[in-house]
Amino acid sequence: MAKEELIEMHGLVDEVLPDSRFRVTLDNGHKLVAYTSGKMRKNHIRILAGDQVSLELSPYDLSKGRITFRHIAGRGPGPAQRPSR
């Protein structure tokens, strides 16, 4: 049996909960509880209330999600630019 595809969504962190969990409101208005992915935890990426994030949702349980990316305001897509000397 093949694995089901994950649903990718964008949302806004409303509240920081204990045990590295977050209350997130998706762009479509749906609210859920999300946790940080292992790579974000490993690299000590901090998530605060008000951050824009990308999430993965399972099609079986839409009340829980995994945060996979934190969008930084003012930085567009693409590789980081090195300052010129």
UniProtKB/Swiss-Prot annotation:
Its main location: cytoplasm. Pfam families: eIF-1a (PF01176). Keywords: Cytoplasm, Initiation factor, Protein biosynthesis, RNA-binding, rRNA-binding. Residues 1-72 form the S1-like domain. It is found in: Cytoplasm. The keyword Hydrolase does not apply. SUPFAM superfamilies: Nucleic acid-binding proteins. PROSITE patterns: S1_IF1_TYPE. It comes from the Bacteria. One of its GO terms (molecular function) is ribosome binding. InterPro entries: NA-bd_OB-fold, RNA-binding_domain_S1_IF1, TIF_IF1. One of its GO terms (cellular component) is cytosol. One of the essential components for the initiation of protein synthesis. Stabilizes the binding of IF-2 and IF-3 on the 30S subunit to which N-formylmethionyl-tRNA(fMet) subsequently binds. Helps modulate mRNA selection, yielding the 30S pre-initiation complex (PIC). Upon addition of the 50S ribosomal subunit IF-1, IF-2 and IF-3 are released leaving the mature 70S translation initiation complex. Component of the 30S ribosomal translation pre-initiation complex which assembles on the 30S ribosome in the order IF-2 and IF-3, IF-1 and N-formylmethionyl-tRNA(fMet); mRNA recruitment can occur at any time during PIC assembly. Belongs to the IF-1 family. This is Translation initiation factor IF-1 2. It comes from Polaromonas sp. (strain JS666 / ATCC BAA-500).
